[in-house]
Swiss-Prot record:
<dbReference type="InterPro" id="IPR007634">
    <property type="entry name" value="RNA_pol_sigma_54_DNA-bd"/>
</dbReference>
<feature type="region of interest" description="Disordered">
    <location>
        <begin position="54"/>
        <end position="92"/>
    </location>
</feature>
<comment type="similarity">
    <text>Belongs to the sigma-54 factor family.</text>
</comment>
<dbReference type="Pfam" id="PF00309">
    <property type="entry name" value="Sigma54_AID"/>
</dbReference>
<keyword id="KW-0808">Transferase</keyword>
<keyword id="KW-0240">DNA-directed RNA polymerase</keyword>
<dbReference type="InterPro" id="IPR038709">
    <property type="entry name" value="RpoN_core-bd_sf"/>
</dbReference>
<dbReference type="GO" id="GO:0001216">
    <property type="term" value="F:DNA-binding transcription activator activity"/>
</dbReference>
<dbReference type="GO" id="GO:0003677">
    <property type="term" value="F:DNA binding"/>
</dbReference>
<dbReference type="InterPro" id="IPR007046">
    <property type="entry name" value="RNA_pol_sigma_54_core-bd"/>
</dbReference>
<keyword id="KW-0731">Sigma factor</keyword>
<dbReference type="GO" id="GO:0000428">
    <property type="term" value="C:DNA-directed RNA polymerase complex"/>
</dbReference>
<feature type="DNA-binding region" description="H-T-H motif">
    <location>
        <begin position="382"/>
        <end position="401"/>
    </location>
</feature>
<protein>
    <recommendedName>
        <fullName>RNA polymerase sigma-54 factor</fullName>
    </recommendedName>
</protein>
<comment type="function">
    <text>Sigma factors are initiation factors that promote the attachment of RNA polymerase to specific initiation sites and are then released. This sigma factor recognizes a DNA element, designated as region A upstream of the pressure-regulated operon.</text>
</comment>
<keyword id="KW-0805">Transcription regulation</keyword>
<dbReference type="Pfam" id="PF04963">
    <property type="entry name" value="Sigma54_CBD"/>
</dbReference>
């Protein structure tokens, strides 16, 4: 056996640091992008703010894009001709110089899951409102008002909710609540029954009297076939203090569980929320800066990047010229290295703007009906539709439409809003799920409140318009819009 040298030729895909940077910038929101730019300005002396620059860096193109003739459908237009290219192509199209250098507690182990509560119904005629400011008390009151209670049970439910603290625990005993109500006709069993119903409110685990009850309520939502659920129940019911004290040896001795079984049961318990009330907290106001503006001028829809939202940076020519004049080799390498980083950063920004503009233009062209007539005219559209039209990969479309917002005459929308699934129609066409939601909202708004429409009736009405929708689909869309069922919408 001897050592030898061999020369081989082959092809290999490589994700360069420059391409990684371009992809990362593409998926940043406008606020995150501003922070990224500020960080680049702070760390790279070759970058500077160009206060005199008016247009965003889009390779010298006019930022305003005429959507041309929207009377034709997006399908018949074929791929859109645009000088913009994908991020990877933008990075490689210009040759660049070669000098670029290149002990845990319960609080620690518990990972909060996203709040399951849906947001308020959205009014598309209003600007983007961000998160709801609803607190725990308001959230429970809202659910109480949607629950069919008798007059006595409604009063009991109100008293129970008023006794729940911000963590979600009941701070008064059943006897204290009974005494505070002062109604001789109400019995302790009635309060217990109403409490059980409230404990099924969102968030699950609410109105528990202690930690053990809180966790058992949540565990009851799991299927009985869930692995290790029986062991988890035993641990919560009988040995919660030992879990808190992390006395695993004593736990294994008392429960006769092997180490692996005990670990699995504890991991299941750690998925539960010991303070469910904190999952519903008043949300802070969220402000959205639109990335794209859509306006109608002389009967034609115009798409433009938001000039106030686009970075205005350039290379500091004074420092760049010092790369040749300096006599120190170390200084020269420092300047040349930062110069290349600055050029790549600016090029990545240009590519981001080009891609965002190109995709936004295609969305507006595809969804012209929405801009003209509203949600009911929304066409079914998936990522692949736009990807084929602009000749980019679906992953690129996904990145450029996430956390990017479009300011339109109908409100501010995330670009992802314009994508929706489809439902077949009798004439062989398709209707988007967004349009179906709009139809449901319209039907509910116009219904006789003494005889509200059931899900089955709405399905029949949509079928009369040629839209085939199952009753279960109607119920799913209705619940997503926080519209109560027909029996709870009925009024005199």
């Amino acid at each position: 056996m001897k050592a030898s040298l061999q020369l081989k030729m082959g092809q290999q895909l490589t994700m360069t640091p420059q391409l990684q940077q371009a992809i990362r910038l593409l998926q940043l929101s406008s606020l995150e992008l501003q922070q990224e730019i500020q960080q680049a300005l702070d760390s790279n002396p070759l970058l500077e703010l160009d206060e005199e620059q008016v247009d965003p860096p889009v390779n010298g193109e006019d930022k305003t894009v005429d959507t041309e003739d929207f009377s034709a459908t997006a399908e018949s237009d074929g791929p859109i001709d645009n000088s913009a290219v994908e991020t990877s192509e933008a990075i490689t199209r210009d040759s660049m110089p070669e000098e670029l250098p290149m002990d845990t507690t319960w609080d620690e182990v518990y990972t909060a899951s996203p709040n399951s509560t849906s947001g308020a119904m959205r009014d598309d005629d209003m600007p983007f409102q961000g998160e709801t400011s609803e607190g725990l008390y308001e959230h429970l009151e809202w659910q109480k008002n949607l629950t069919p209670f008798s007059d006595n049970d409604l009063a009991i439910a109100t008293a129970i909710i008023e006794a729940i603290d911000e963590r979600g625990y009941l701070t008064q005993s059943i006897e204290d609540i009974l005494e505070a109500m002062g109604d001789p006709e109400i019995e302790q069993d009635e309060i217990e029954a109403v409490l059980k119903r409230i404990q099924h409110f969102d968030p699950i685990g609410i109105a528990a009297r202690d930690l053990s009850e809180c966790l058992l309520i949540q565990l009851a939502q799991y299927a009985d076939t869930t692995p290790h659920i029986d062991n988890a129940r035993i641990l919560i019911r009988d040995h919660l203090d030992l879990i808190a004290g992390r006395d695993f040896r004593l736990l294994m001795r008392k429960t006769k569980l092997k180490e692996d079984a005990l670990r699995d049961a504890i991991e299941l318990i750690q998925t539960l929320n010991p303070r469910p009330g904190l999952a519903v907290t008043p949300g802070k106001d969220e402000y959205v800066i639109p990335d794209v503006t859509v306006t109608k001028k002389k009967g034609r829809w115009m798409v433009e990047l938001n000039p106030d939202n686009m970075p205005k940076i350039s290379v500091n020519q004074h420092y760049a010229s010092m790369a040749k004049s300096t006599k120190s080799q170390a200084d020269s390498q420092f300047i040349r290295g930062h110069l290349q980083e600055a050029k790549w950063f600016i090029k990545s920004l240009e590519s981001r703007n080009e891609t965002l503009l190109k995709v936004s233009k295609c969305i507006v062209k595809f969804q012209q009906g929405f801009f003209e007539f509203g949600e009911e005219a929304m066409k079914p559209m998936v990522l692949n539709d736009i990807a084929e039209a602009v000749e980019m990969h679906e992953s690129t479309i996904s990145r450029v439409t996430t956390q990017k917002y479009m300011h339109t005459p109908r409100g501010i929308f995330e670009l992802k809003y314009f994508f929706s699934s489809h439902v077949a129609t009798d004439d062989g066409g398709e209707c988007s799920s967004t349009a179906i939601r709009a139809f449901i909202k319209k039907l509910v708004a116009a219904e006789n409140q003494q005889k509200p429409l059931s899900d089955s009736k709405m399905a029949l009405l949509l079928a009369d318009q040629g839209i085939k929708v199952a009753r279960r689909t109607i119920a799913k869309y209705r619940e997503a819009m926080l519209i109560p069922p027909s029996n709870q919408r009925k009024s005199l």
